[in-house]
């Protein structure tokens, strides 16, 4: 039985289908969600089940702050303030916000996966080990700061390069074989991205 294309919601017949993200699409419906560029199965990024071209769209929308879209993995990291050294002890609430915090309740600590370093200079928490990430040891990916050794594939544990890996539900994965095996179309050939063995028409019926 023919499946429905997730882009146009129309029937996808065997001769016109491509498979990606575990779904069957019309060839020309597999487009970047942001710029509408036609994509190749296995040759694009994914976010919340939607396809995106790797650059510039995925890097611009979901990459770390300051990403250089001219080359994956090239980043301009924020420099620590020269006037305010990094705080290693308890966080102090700035004077300018004291009254505002009093009105809204007691101050809260930083989020474990804050996407940017807060303006007081205190380091963020690594989403992998839940420990503080200081400027000299951090890499930024998926909008979070990680220790360099902590940015690893969720499945195989391989160390990854910022901007050079896939993402699913906010977790990093190496493009192949792990992302292809877990989330790629059925029959993915992990030896070469974009090489697929499509399912034959299960009923062996001729095209309408």
Curated annotation (Swiss-Prot):
Residues 5-57, 126-178 form the LIM zinc-binding domain. SUPFAM superfamilies: Glucocorticoid receptor-like (DNA-binding domain) (SSF57716). The modification Phosphoserine is found at residue 104. Keywords: Acetylation, LIM domain, Metal-binding, Phosphoprotein, Repeat, Zinc. InterPro entries: Znf_LIM (IPR001781). GO terms for molecular function: metal ion binding. CDD domains: LIM1_TLP, LIM_CRIP. The modification N6-acetyllysine is found at residues 23, 138, 144. Residues 104-115 have a biased composition (Low complexity). SMART domains: LIM. Residues 98-117 are annotated as: Disordered. Pfam families: LIM. Interacts with TGFB1I1. PANTHER family: CYSTEINE-RICH PROTEIN 2 (PTHR46074:SF2), CYSTEINE-RICH PROTEIN CRIP FAMILY MEMBER (PTHR46074). This is Cysteine-rich protein 2.
């Amino acid at each position: 039985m023919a499946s429905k294309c997730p882009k146009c919601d129309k029937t996808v017949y065997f001769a016109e289908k491509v498979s990606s993200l575990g779904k069957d699409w019309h060839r020309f419906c597999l487009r970047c969600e942001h710029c509408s560029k036609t994509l190749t199965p296995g040759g694009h990024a994914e976010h919340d089940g939607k396809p995106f071209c790797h650059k510039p769209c995925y890097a611009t929308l979901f990459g770390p702050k300051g990403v250089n879209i001219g080359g994956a993995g090239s980043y301009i990291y924020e420099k620590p303030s020269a006037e305010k050294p990094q705080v290693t002890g308890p966080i102090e609430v700035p004077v300018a916000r004291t009254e505002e915090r009093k009105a809204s309740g007691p101050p809260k600590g930083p989020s474990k996966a804050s996407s940017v370093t807060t303006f007081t200079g205190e380091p963020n928490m690594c989403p992998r080990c839940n420990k503080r990430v200081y400027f000299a040891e951090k890499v930024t990916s998926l909008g979070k700061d990680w220790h360099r050794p902590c940015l690893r594939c969720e499945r195989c544990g391989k160390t990854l390069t910022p901007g050079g890996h896939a993402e699913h539900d906010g977790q990093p994965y190496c493009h192949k074989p792990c992302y292809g095996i877990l989330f790629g179309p059925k029959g993915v050939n992990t030896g070469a991205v974009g090489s697929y063995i499509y399912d034959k028409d299960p009923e062996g019926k001729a095209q309408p």
